[in-house]
Amino acid sequence: MRCPFCGNENTRVIDTRAAEDGFAIKRRRECENCSKRFTTYERLDDRPLIVVKKDGSKQLFDKHKIYTGLLKACEKRPIAESKLLEIAEEIERELKNRLEQEVTSLEIGEMVMSRLKKLDEVAYVRFASVYRQFKDVNSFLEELKKLLNGGENS
């Protein structure tokens, strides 16, 4: 590794630790020429995750979209924003740990809904009303009945 201070290629590793929840390795290095220390990170070559939308179009996965959807669903609910970010990161981690590079927007929506259902029923219903695009009041009531009856098939 080339020293960022003097450009010398002879450096030695003085400390190695796991970083970023085990997805990276942090190394402290020391230049053998100028004795200055610096940090490097080693990460897997991150393959982009592709979302296949309902209309068949594709776009890059964006964790921020999950987070903003959670924020809207949980607006004026007693839920910390840090918890919502944690959920978005958990979903991202789960998706990246899969072998597939593509995921459908439907799968992501179901992952969000299952977590919201455990977190806050009002937020779950809010999210479901937008995500499931209920055609009428009766289909909305059916979803509420499922929720009240313990959640079969939802």
Curated annotation (Swiss-Prot):
Cofactor mode of binding and number, as noted: Binds 1 zinc ion.
Required co-factors: Zn(2+)
Signal peptide positions (record): none
Pfam name, any one: ATP-cone
Gene Ontology molecular function terms on file: ATP binding; DNA binding; zinc ion binding
GO biological process: negative regulation of DNA-templated transcription
InterPro entries for this protein: ATP-cone_dom, NrdR-like_N, RNR_NrdR-like
Domain ATP-cone: 49-139
Keyword Nucleus: no
Record carries keyword Manganese: no
Zinc finger (unnamed) boundaries: 3-34
Keyword set, alphabetical order: ATP-binding, DNA-binding, Metal-binding, Nucleotide-binding, Repressor, Transcription, Transcription regulation, Zinc, Zinc-finger
NCBIfam families, alphabetized: transcriptional regulator NrdR
Membership in a protein family: Belongs to the NrdR family.
Role: Negatively regulates transcription of bacterial ribonucleotide reductase nrd genes and operons by binding to NrdR-boxes.
Identification of the protein by name: Transcriptional repressor NrdR
Organism: Carboxydothermus hydrogenoformans (strain ATCC BAA-161 / DSM 6008 / Z-2901)
